A protein has these predicted regions:
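Pro/Thr/Ser/Gly-rich low-complexity, intrinsically disordered linker/stalk tracts
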Residues: 54-110, 163-177
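Beta-strand-rich modules
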Residues: 144-168
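Solvent-exposed loop/turn segments flanking beta-strands in beta-repeat/beta-sandwich domains
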Residues: 103-129, 153
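Substrate-binding cleft of secreted/luminal carbohydrate-active enzymes
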Residues: 1-75
Length: 177
């Protein structure tokens, strides 16, 4: 289930239990308290773009800090694509690029249409459920790496998404950047 949020009403009216703030914190807490709620849509979009009541600022800084994956439509298809292949770091005139090959697919529904790139510290445990590690969601089978001093070790992890947002198993590579 997805909830429709009226941006003007949310920022215009005070929280009944804390009149010094608007309703956004309580609405977000309530929405996140129920596992059956998959997210929300904001109405009307121009109010978000115009940043009415600093609504957009709050979404960016507090509630949606990190990229997110669209919920899986597993009631239509729950088969994830195969994992990416041949992942490697290549030096180009634009710097280091992480390249990979799209997985093979038997049907159109199994084709990879996007890739998720995660970055973890060298000794950090890989946790794909933590969106703070997502550095890119891309249609391209490559990612420009942020080269630093060449001494810091990272683990990059790439997964493939099909058109119904099923996520493949991960492939990882340790890199010095």
């Amino acid at each position: 289930m997805f909830i429709g949020q009226s941006v003007p009403k949310t920022v215009q009216f005070a929280d009944p239990q804390n009149p010094s703030i608007n309703q956004l914190p309580r609405k977000m807490a309530l929405q996140r308290a129920y596992q059956t709620i998959g997210g929300s849509c904001q109405w009307y979009a121009a109010a978000v773009v115009e940043n009415q009541g600093r609504y957009r600022d709050a979404l960016i800084s507090e509630y949606h800090k990190y990229p997110a994956l669209v919920p899986v439509f597993d009631f239509m298809d729950d088969k994830a694509p195969d994992k990416v292949r041949k992942m490697k770091k290549v030096w180009t005139e634009d710097g280091y690029i992480l390249f990979w090959t799209a997985p093979k697919a038997d049907t159109e529904m199994d084709k990879a249409v996007r890739y998720v790139v995660y970055r973890f510290g060298n000794k950090e445990k890989v946790n794909l459920d933590d969106p703070s590690h997502i550095v890119a969601i891309t249609r391209n089978p490559f990612y420009k790496l942020p080269y630093e001093t060449g001494k810091t070790k990272y683990r990059y992890v790439v997964t493939a998404l099909d058109r119904l947002h099923n996520e493949s198993k991960s492939v990882s590579k340790k890199l010095k950047l």
